[in-house]
Amino acid sequence: PVLALGLTKLIKPSRKIDETNINITNSWLSVNNWLIDQVLPQLKWHISVEDGLDLNLQGRYLMTCNHQSWVDTTVAQYFGLTRMPLTRFFTKWELIFIPFVGQAFKILGFPMMKRHTKAQIAKNPELKYRDLEEARKSCQQLLSQPFTLLNYLEGTRFSPEKHAKQQSPYQNLLKPKAGGLALALNILENEIDAL
């Protein structure tokens, strides 16, 4: 349904289509959360929210998270489903080629980033600015609706190999990369209700 509505959005953009897609996605996430509760009934969640932080489904939030495993996004969605707007996060452009998943990311307004190597940027410095412009446009598109934008400060999932290669000063974390967060704050700073 999300993809079909997304195609109609190409012909005639509509806030109603966006809202319907969000509702469909939230229904799917509700089923996912129910499945998690069934498969892991003894799971104990320890999630803390800053005192006085008033989260709501109509808010605009920027969320940061360490990226320990592929489960991180599932946990963020589980936590946020009834507390915050749909959680979106920066994704790799290459995911657009995964049938259904990549297209759903695009339709739902997930900011998609192309990754360029240092060698590619050195050869063509414009690539760096082109990607920043795409990220800026993606962030600005979020402003037409309530949103939660998740930023993994480490930029990639933790692994012992990456940790050793980076010589991270942190025991269980990679070195943070502030670029994505700085970009989002720069674009959204006056529009977010909480970080």
For the regions a language model picked out, list residue spans one by one.
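Soluble catalytic domains of membrane acyltransferases
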Residues: 39-195
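Membrane-anchoring hydrophobic helices of lipid-metabolizing enzymes
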Residues: 1-61, 75
